[in-house]
A protein has these predicted regions:
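Soluble catalytic regions of membrane-associated enzymes that act on cell-envelope
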Residues: 1-87, 120-122, 139
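A structural signal for well-ordered alpha-helical scaffolds and beta->alpha junctions
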Residues: 3, 41, 95, 111, ...
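CN hydrolase (nitrilase-like) catalytic-core segments centered on the catalytic cysteine
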Residues: 17, 23-25, 32-56, 123-216
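Short linear motifs in intrinsically disordered
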Residues: 61-62, 104-110, 172, 180-184
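A short catalytic or substrate-binding loop motif that flags glycine-/basic-rich loops and adjacent residues
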Residues: 62-65, 109-110, 206-210
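A short acidic, often aromatic-flanked loop/helix-cap motif at beta-alpha or helix-coil junctions
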Residues: 63-64, 86-89, 190-191, 210
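Active-site catalytic loop in hydrolytic enzyme cores
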Residues: 65-136
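Short, surface-exposed linear segments at secondary-structure transitions and domain or protein termini
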Residues: 87-95, 209-218
């Protein structure tokens, strides 16, 4: 299973945080993935994985919330953040309709997230979900690192897809903080890392195209 593979990977690699991309594999949108998600959470709790490695998970629907939800889970905190920027017709309705959890549409959050940041090893981390990163934060305290959980796969137009991911990552860095590193984690490979001095880590990008787990050094 993915969890067992992840445990094996973590036993061989020293990491500070485990981050999942935005995905539809885990969540509560239907009974099948809900059961898979419950099993994942149960195993994490049994192994107390969150005490060894803080986790930034992503769920397609979370418990009663009909939206994409990022969950930061550490020994000290469990912080939820909903996806704020939903695309009309594709992810949400046009007129603010409310949909049930099992719908193929999501619900627009009624208010902005209170928690967009968390601190790990004295580093203030800005966690964003996909297109949320394209819109500037009103916070006056800049993050030391931005992590974006993304799934651009529906924009995959063949040979130009690489540029789509790259341009989205660059625009996000302009938006969130031009002076700190940014990691844009893609669900089907193509993870982009941009350093504080704007260098692209193409080694990480290439590895992410075929490796299920990768270590990113900042």
């Amino acid at each position: 299973t993915l969890y067992n593979d992840l445990k094996l990977f973590l036993s061989k690699n020293n990491v500070d945080i485990v981050v999942f991309s935005e995905n539809v594999y885990y969540g509560y949108k239907n009974h099948y993935i809900a059961e898979r998600t419950r099993q994942l959470i149960k195993k994490i709790e049994q192994d107390k994985l969150f005490t060894k490695h803080p986790l930034l998970l992503s769920f397609y629907g979370y418990e009663y919330i009909n939206n994409v939800v990022a969950v930061y889970w550490s020994q000290q905190d469990m912080i939820l953040r909903q996806k704020e920027i939903l695309i009309p017709f594709f992810e949400k309705g046009v007129f603010g309709e409310e949909y049930s959890l099992i719908s193929d549409r999501l619900n627009q959050p009624k208010s902005k997230n209170k928690h967009g940041y968390f601190t790990m090893n004295n580093i203030r981390i800005n966690a964003r979900i996909c297109y949320d990163a394209l819109f500037p934060s009103i916070s006056k305290t800049y993050p030391g690192l931005t992590i974006i959980q993304s799934d651009y796969s529906w924009l995959n137009n063949g040979s130009a897809y690489k540029n789509t991911i790259l341009n989205g990552s660059i625009l996000s860095k302009f938006s969130v903080n031009i002076h700190s590193p940014l990691i844009n984690i893609q669900n089907y490979g193509g993870t982009i890392v941009i350093s504080d001095d704007w260098k692209i880590n193409w080694d990480v990008y290439n590895k992410s195209l075929y490796m299920p787990f990768i270590v990113i050094e900042i």
